[in-house]
Amino acid sequence: MFYYPNVLQRHTGCFATIWLAATRGSRLVKREYLNVNVVKTCEEILNYVLVRVQPPVAGLPRPRFSLYLSAQLQIGVIRVYFQQCQYLVEDIQHILEHLHRAQLRIRIDMEEADLPSLLLPNCLAMMETLEDAPEPFFGKMSVDPRLPSPFDIPQIRHLLEAATPEKTRKETLPEATPDPRKPDRTLATVQSPEVITLQEAEPIRMLQIEGEQDLPEISRGDLELLIAEKDDAILLEERQRGRLLRQRRASLPLDESREEPRALEGAGLVSALSPPAPAQVEGIQEALPGQVFPPEVQKMTGWEPGALLTEVTPPQELRLPAPPSTEKRLPSLQRPLPRRHRRRQLLFWDKETQISREKFEEQLQTGAHCWEYPVAQPPKRMLTSPAELFRTPTLSGWLPPELLGLWTHCAQVPQRMLRQRPQLETEETVEEERAADEEERRKTEALSEIEVLREAQEPSGPLMLSSELSLEAAEDEKSRTSLIPPEWWAWSEEGQPEPPALPMLPELPEVPMEMPPRPELSSEAVLRAVALKLQANKELDFSSLVPPLSPRKLASRVFYLLLVLSTQKILLVEQQKPYGPLLIRPGPKFP
């Protein structure tokens, strides 16, 4: 080994950064590049290569570097030095940009000497200087502010006063003539001016094709033929031409023997029909003066095709029909007309896409597909009489026997004797009934007094008066209706004869019944009830004293008596939160 490992260790070895820069083992930062002293590092590398470095321990040989290591260290020094130069150039460029931006800034603060000329005049100071009357004899009482002159603006004064710099032309130095004594040595890095000079791109040239012919231009007749697609005359003409072409094809095998003597004639007609050579046709006609034409061809002497040679396809108004015999014998000489694009037609698989009306009606008349809707015939007897409905409440077998017995008992029609009015009673029976009513009234009064006393003695029960109970019971008895509804009476009376008329009785005057006065609840009864509740329970509230389902009048009466007892300091009524329970506690004067 020609070097020690501690030389290349990172952060400790003297060649660690150079070794990493040469081998690119890891990424280096700017601080590591700038920490390398290039001059000192080069001297140390030279000392190691020339074996001038002392051994770290006495007695050991001097450290040496191999050729590979010395080459790698030299490459590393070059890369570190190049990166340091890059950092230096970037810093200089950054500083120059800052200086340039600082020079471009315009001074916006005005100097104190320029402020008075740019501000409005102080009227108070002018009045003091002019003794309160600036030129009073000439009628001038104020001084208008003057606008500042552009030459007084400090920002652009130096720009207006400075002269425009002239453009200096660079003098071209004469080219130095090469010394003939010195041989021409062209460096490998220098290229010739022809190589580095930009040249214009050559235009793309189209290759010429031999035998290429330009297509004839579309004439006016062709355009009219293409535009007039909906014209019926053109369609008919095309059909006629199609028929003529079919006839020509059929007549070709018959006329093969006659085509040989007409070869020259066909060549002349072809040249006559081609657009660019009208003169050749005349030359051919003059060169063959003694040619004998058949009688069919001599008929074409009256037709002048020279007027149609200027266009490829002649217009429609100048087109003259040729004799049928010539067209039959010269099928290949006529120029094929451009095919007209037909409109795209929809193809249907079925020839008849819609059924005819007669066939449709015929299919509707057949009864194999359209049957009449069968009308459901109801049974002959669907409705039941009211008597049958009253006798049978529901379907048989649905009601249990107990309910069915009650229904049959209530559904019985009353007898006739019960429905008749009671006969005229005698005076004795009336007096007996009055005596019985008085006895019953006395008994009810005695019972009501007893119930009031019992309620006072037993206040733990609900605070409801016996009279109220008796009245409610009487109202319930009055509100009860008879088990037999009046409709049944009407149904039962329909089928029976009317009862005989009874004599009218004189109306008796109604005696109003005076209800006994209801005894009001006293505070002593409320106090007893509260005392009994407090003995049973430690805490007592208003809801336990008066049940929630008690009458409103009773609740208001008890609440009023509680307020009276609280004012007398016998009871204390408290409510801790709104809408909370009313707590009832004994007061200071509670017995």
From Swiss-Prot:
Q: Which residues carry this modification: Phosphoserine?
A: S149, S192
Q: Which InterPro entries match?
A: Rad21/Rec8-like, Rad21/Rec8_C_eu, Rad21_Rec8_N, ScpA-like_C, WH_DNA-bd_sf
A GO BP term here is: meiotic cell cycle
Where Phosphothreonine occurs, the residues are T164
Q: Name one GO cellular component term.
A: condensed chromosome
- Would the keyword Coiled coil be found if you checked this record's keyword annotation? no
Q: Name one Pfam family in it.
A: Rad21_Rec8_N
Q: Which UniProt keywords apply?
A: Centromere, Chromosome, Chromosome partition, Meiosis, Nucleus, Phosphoprotein
Comp. bias (Basic and acidic residues): 163-185
**Origin superkingdom:** Eukaryota
What does the PTM comment state?
Phosphorylated.
What happens without the gene?
Mice display a high mortality rate, both during embryogenesis and after birth, germ cell failure and sterility. Mutant females exhibit ovarian dysgenesis and lack ovarian follicles at reproductive maturity. Affected males have small testes due to arrest of spermatogenesis during meiotic prophase I. Early chromosome pairing appears normal but synapsis occurs between sister chromatids rather than between homologous chromosomes.
The record's section on CDD domains has: Rad21_Rec8_M_Rec8
Question: Which region ranges are annotated with the description Disordered?
Answer: 163-186, 316-336, 420-447
Q: Give the location in the cell.
A: Nucleus; Chromosome; Chromosome, Centromere
Function recorded in the entry: Required during meiosis for separation of sister chromatids and homologous chromosomes. Proteolytic cleavage of REC8 on chromosome arms by separin during anaphase I allows for homologous chromosome separation in meiosis I and cleavage of REC8 on centromeres during anaphase II allows for sister chromatid separation in meiosis II.
What does the subunit comment say?
Interacts (phosphorylated and unphosphorylated form) with SMC3. Interacts with SYCP3. Interacts (phosphorylated and unphosphorylated form) with SMC1B. Does not interact with SMC1A. Interacts with RAD51. Forms a complex with EWSR1, PRDM9, SYCP3 and SYCP1; complex formation is dependent of phosphorylated form of REC8 and requires PRDM9 bound to hotspot DNA; EWSR1 joins PRDM9 with the chromosomal axis through REC8.
The protein depicted here goes by the name: Meiotic recombination protein REC8 homolog
**Organism for this UniProt entry:** Mus musculus
